[in-house]
């Protein structure tokens, strides 16, 4: 699908609050989130249109929640296949690991297949909602420089015209070969896998079985994935001595496909492309007024489908912080928490992806034999088998420092973890997901209590200036009890009983939830005021009447 760039006037000598380099998924998500926050954004993209061939094929529950946060999830869902299981097969076809988590704690299925070009198109179309956001295609970023209070970008159009853009901040979403990262000499440390893989996408799926299968064939490992809209993806390891040109030849392509199809000649090829699996992590995510996100900050093998999703986590973590800084509601030190929170988890996902690749294609043949034997034993260890089945090995993001307040060293503290998203009942009787009731805001959520009770008037003013929603959760049968209403507080019913269970488990009655849906702090009514003061301090929030016009980057 070819998505042409919109007819927009060039931004010659134009000033914006945020310039985003790259109109890939991370750049588009950043632009959508900042756009809805009223930030003046310019996206510049080297290509003349969105990439129109499939790349990533897995989108998880956290990424769908991010789509929900910018009002696009309903447009994205038609291009997904929910509850998409991943099955690892031995060379003889026995399934030794069946990963099909059925949890929806964040409001959406944990594993989903998707068609990336169509989802990217949804995000690009989403930008048309915001007059403060523009996207310029066919613009090459030739150079940039930082000053105390701005970044100057030098662009070149396809016709050779030069343009200058001045921005308060530059977010580099320009991919694994990031020009911005290389120009700043930020080390991009890691490894490149010795073997390449050839990806073959086929229309009118000739196999049409559901889910994704990864076969640990020692002769040539391969992957078979069912995608939405009747697309089938096959991936085959490129063996030593083979080249992409050789594998593209009809007789060799026929030989590859004969491993997985009875009639390799009767297929409709979309494309064939060879990939190298890299595992690399930028040493720094922030360099003064430049921030790295997505593949510009980290790249990982595809085996857990987390490259795309990690980029979405970057965008969700960074966008609300950047908006607060630009709006003068927080000092720019808040942006330092972006690397503090995201870098360690990105590394954990890289390590998991590398491990999954080694399980599929062990470096040594004896390791594959050992894998098959151990996997057989798992059938006799149900708790261990469930651990894999429910995908509990996936490192869930948890932040131990940053824009949050942790009391003590409680091992099972919910602070720094994503808050659940169950369905809730509104006072008018509508049932909706929790985030829909909150919007793109902070929230102070209390079980049964008035969340304003423990706050001073000054605190209420400060947190309302951030757009904070104050939520009182009650058992659904109490939702229409008028005597419990409080001005400025939204009451919701605990439709599924999940919120009561969550608060009971964590021995807290109040949660401060950030716009990216992570728990910033927990409290009880008597400690909420003190906790909010600590949180305002670590987030470097300004007072509603504070003058931050002299803010400088350290």
Swiss-Prot record:
Family, as annotated: Belongs to the PheA/TfdB FAD monooxygenase family.
Reactions catalysed according to its record: 3-(3-hydroxyphenyl)propanoate + NADH + O2 + H(+) = 3-(2,3-dihydroxyphenyl)propanoate + NAD(+) + H2O; (2E)-3-(3-hydroxyphenyl)prop-2-enoate + NADH + O2 + H(+) = (2E)-3-(2,3-dihydroxyphenyl)prop-2-enoate + NAD(+) + H2O
Protein's name in the database: 3-(3-hydroxy-phenyl)propionate/3-hydroxycinnamic acid hydroxylase
Oxidoreductase in keyword set: yes
UniProt keyword annotations, A-Z: Aromatic hydrocarbons catabolism, FAD, Flavoprotein, NAD, Oxidoreductase
Record-level GO BP terms: 3-(3-hydroxy)phenylpropionate catabolic process; 3-phenylpropionate catabolic process
Xref: InterPro entries: 3-HPP/3HCI_hydroxylase, FAD-bd, FAD/NAD-bd_sf, PheA/TfdB_FAD_monoxygenase
Disulfide bond residue pairs: none
């Amino acid at each position: 699908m070819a998505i042409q760039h919109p007819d927009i006037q060039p931004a010659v000598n134009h000033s914006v609050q945020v310039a985003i380099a790259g109109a890939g998924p991370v750049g588009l998500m950043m632009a959508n989130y900042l756009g809805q926050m009223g930030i003046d954004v310019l996206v510049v993209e080297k290509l003349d249109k969105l990439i129109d061939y499939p790349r990533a094929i897995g989108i998880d529950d956290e990424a769908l929640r991010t789509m929900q946060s910018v009002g696009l999830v309903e447009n994205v869902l038609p291009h997904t296949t929910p509850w998409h299981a991943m099955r690892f097969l031995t060379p003889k076809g026995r399934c030794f690991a069946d990963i099909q988590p059925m949890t929806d704690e964040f409001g959406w299925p944990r594993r989903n297949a998707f068609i990336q070009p169509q989802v990217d198109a949804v995000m690009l179309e989403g930008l048309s909602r915001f007059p403060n956001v523009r996207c310029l295609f066919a613009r090459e970023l030739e150079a940039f420089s930082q000053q105390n209070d701005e970044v100057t970008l030098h662009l070149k159009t396809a016709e050779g015209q030069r343009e200058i853009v001045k921005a308060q901040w530059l977010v580099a979403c320009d991919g694994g070969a990031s020009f911005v990262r290389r120009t700043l000499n930020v080390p991009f440390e890691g490894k490149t896998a010795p073997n390449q893989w050839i990806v073959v996408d086929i229309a009118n799926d000739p196999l049409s079985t559901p889910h994704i299968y990864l076969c640990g064939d020692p002769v040539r490992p391969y992957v078979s994935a069912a995608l939405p809209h009747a697309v089938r993806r096959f991936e085959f390891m490129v063996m030593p001595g083979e080249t992409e040109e050789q594998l593209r030849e009809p007789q060799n392509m026929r030989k590859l496909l004969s491993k997985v199809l009875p009639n390799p000649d009767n297929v409709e090829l979309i494309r064939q492309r060879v990939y190298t699996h890299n595992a690399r992590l930028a040493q720094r995510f922030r360099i003064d007024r430049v921030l790295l996100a997505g593949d510009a900050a980290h790249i990982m093998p595809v085996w857990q489908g987390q490259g795309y999703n990690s980029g979405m986590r970057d965008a969700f973590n960074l966008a609300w912080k950047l908006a607060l800084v630009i709006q003068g509601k927080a000092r720019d030190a808040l942006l330092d928490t972006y690397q503090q929170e995201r870098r360690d988890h990105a590394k954990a996902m890289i390590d998991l992806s590398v491990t999954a690749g080694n399980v599929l294609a062990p470096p040594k043949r004896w390791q594959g034999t050992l894998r098959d034997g151990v996997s057989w034993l798992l059938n006799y260890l149900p708790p261990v088998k469930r651990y894999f089945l429910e995908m509990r090995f996936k490192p869930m993001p948890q932040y131990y420092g940053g824009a949050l307040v942790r009391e003590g060293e409680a091992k099972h503290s919910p602070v720094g973890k994503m808050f659940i998203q169950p369905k809730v009942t509104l006072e008018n009787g509508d049932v909706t997901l929790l985030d829909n009731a909150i919007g793109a805001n902070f929230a102070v959520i209390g079980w049964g209590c008035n969340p304003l009770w423990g706050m001073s008037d000054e605190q209420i003013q400060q947190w309302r200036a951030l757009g904070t929603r104050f939520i009182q959760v009650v058992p659904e049968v109490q939702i229409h009890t008028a005597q419990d209403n409080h001005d400025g507080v939204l009451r919701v019913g605990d439709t599924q009983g999940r919120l009561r269970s969550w608060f009971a488990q964590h021995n807290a009655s109040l949660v401060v939830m950030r716009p990216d849906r992570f728990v910033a702090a927990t409290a009880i009514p008597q400690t909420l005021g003190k906790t909010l003061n600590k949180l305002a301090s670590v987030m470097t929030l300004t007072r509603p009447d504070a003058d931050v016009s002299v803010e400088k980057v350290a």
